[in-house]
Amino acid sequence: MRAEPFSLGGMPALRWGRPSRQGILYLHGQGGSKAEAAFFAAAAADAGWQTVSVDLPGHGDRESEAAALVPWQVVPELRCALAELRGRWDRVGLFGSSLGAWFGLLAYPDAPLAAALFLSP
């Protein structure tokens, strides 16, 4: 599956799958990057969901921003990202792996999500 690079709230991001009215924000774990979402995105696309993955600070295209990998930096970025995605999709879900799951839980404690999948939070 091919991914389309773009910027989501100033974060480097990849858009996976066909346009859809429902989508999942994919948050990688420690040492990961937005590119690791390929396998998940393929399965989500088969179920009719588009996936967007982002690089957290200190990872992928943001390696030089390691000092910004703190909740008071990441949580506002993720909240902006979700707000932008809500403008594109009717239904929004979240997948978080490890560090991404932790940041997802911090950023969206009360967000009305259509689905939430956490791997090793």
Where are these regions (language model features)?
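N-terminal cap/lid segment of alpha/beta-hydrolase-fold proteins
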Residues: 1-19
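Proline/glycine-enriched tight loop/beta-turn segments at coil->beta junctions
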Residues: 17-23, 49
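The conserved beta1-alpha1 loop
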Residues: 25-29
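The serine-hydrolase catalytic nucleophile loop
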Residues: 30-42
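Conserved alpha/beta-hydrolase
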Residues: 44-63
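Catalytic nucleophile-loop/oxyanion-hole region of alpha/beta-hydrolase
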Residues: 60-88
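Gly/Ala-rich beta-loop-alpha elbow adjacent to hydrolase catalytic centers
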Residues: 96-104
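Active-site nucleophile loop of the alpha/beta-hydrolase fold
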Residues: 117-121
